[in-house]
Amino acid sequence: MTKETVAENFKNGIDCGQVVAGQFEEETGCTLSRLRKMSACYAAGMMRGETCGAVLAAYNVIGLIYGHDEEGDDAQKGQMLQKMLRFNELFGEKYSQGFQCKELLGADISTPEGGKKINEENLLFNLCPAICCDVVEVLKKVISE
C-alpha cells in the first residue's frame, strides 16, 4: 500500500478506515466487503474531527483478531488490551499531537474555518494517506509481535 493508492481509494469514495481495515482480510478472516462496511462511518473522525477513522479501523482489526466474546474471558481480553495499548504506544510515537483528526490535521473539519483550511491545503489527500499507511505499518507490527 502506498500513499498514492490510498489517495486513489479516497477519490473513488473509499475512506480512511475502510482503506486500513481492508488491508487485513487474511488476518481477520473477513471479506474486503465486510471490513469496508464495518469501517464505513469513520471518515474524518466520524465527520466531527474526533478519533481518526484509520485508528478506529485499527481497533476494529485488533478486536476481530484478539477480542473476547465470552463472559469471563479475562485472558483473551487482556491480550486484546495489550495489543491495543501497544498500537497506541507505537502510533503515539509517530503522531505525538494525538489521535483526533483535528489534532492530526491541525484543523477541525466540523467547523467552517477548519473545513476551509483542510480544503485549501488539500490535507485529506496530502496528509491522510500517509497516516493510513503508518496505521497499517504499526498495526502489522503489533500483530506480528
PLM regions: where:
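Short alpha-helical scaffolding segments that buttress acidic/His motifs in well-ordered protein cores
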Residues: V20, M38-A43
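Active-site-proximal helix-loop elements at catalytic-domain edges
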Residues: M1-E27
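A short glycine/serine-rich beta->alpha loop
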Residues: K3-K11, C41-E50, E120-L124
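DPxDG-like acidic metal-binding loop motif
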Residues: A57-I65
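Phosphate-handling active-site elements
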Residues: E26-K37, L64-R86
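Active-site nucleophile and cofactor-binding loops and adjacent substrate-binding regions
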Residues: L35, M47-A54
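Short, contiguous, pocket-lining structural segments
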Residues: N12-C16, C30, L127, I131
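C-terminal binding/interaction regions
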Residues: L81-E145
